[in-house]
Amino acid sequence: MTPHLPTSLTGSTSVRLAFATAAVLSMLGGTAEAEEGGTGHYLPGSMASSIDSAPAKESFLMRLNVVNYDGSIGKNQPLPIAGLTAVGVDAKSTGVGLTAVWRPSFEIGEGWSYALTATLPYVWLDVSADVGAQGLAVRRSSSVNGLGDIVLQPLLINQNVNPDFNINYRVSLYAPTGSYEVGRLANTGKNFWTVEPTVGFMYFGQKNGIEASTFVGVDFNRTNPDTDYKSGTQVHVDATLAQHFPWQGGLVGLGINAYYYQQVTGDSGAGATPGDFKAKTLGLGPVASFVGKVGGHDLVSELKWVHESSTTNRLKGDLIWLKVLYKFY
């Protein structure tokens, strides 16, 4: 039986995991990659597969994303967190994000379509770390929950090259809407703006069921006005290779997800006391998906686990993602 990909995965449905970005990374108001607090707005691995593609036809979509992260960094690596210098950082977080995607009816050219998205993240975060001068550090803990940094995507363009291949062009804006306090280990927001252009290349064979997707993005960060800390520019590459096959009237996909993250410019500002603090990391793990119909409309779900390795100047840990997307029309 030849697998047939529903329109929700050929480019007519999609949402981005940016909310997970806000849901997990934003909530790590100081704990995860490099940059201030050891984390940026973008969560590596958040855009990596066809479920993160852009709509090619008129549609309205909603997606629920649930992300769990558990990471730590050793006591030999100091992290700048909300005006503090911390070592031995442990962070556990859960983020729930709701993303709305609207693709209007008008076309911008043959094979080209436009959409826009907005994401509301809610996060729970627990952070513990040793804070203070060397030899006098005190173990501190902080827990917080609330609205994270909202993600707006005013520009999301899809180029339908052929039935099997699409290219996405998008610009995301991370707004500092989450809670932030200087001197608090856990914050639901980053307290600065980020602009993130991304290009995604998605191949999905309508006859062979093979998926090969790659997303390349760059994050440009503004200065945190409360700490005078400007996080450096980051480049991230995320990819998925999967095989999809018919099952129970739908499509099942099994494959692997990988990402590479590299900070390409150093941190700056009066608050960047640890220096330029560049970071990098590599992640790899399995991914499974299912596409079916509910109420006559496409329902897409994806579950994946990503394990981090080869990590420098950021937390190292594991992420578990669950994404559920529903196409209303």
Region annotations inferred by a language model:
Residues 35-41, 70-95, 131-143, 185-186:
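Surface-exposed strand-loop-strand hairpins of Gram-negative outer-membrane beta-barrel proteins
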Residues 53, 64, 98-104, 152-158, ...:
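Residues on the lipid-exposed face of transmembrane beta-strands in outer-membrane beta-barrel proteins
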Residues 86-153, 160:
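Long, hydrophobic/aromatic-enriched structural stretches that serve as scaffold segments
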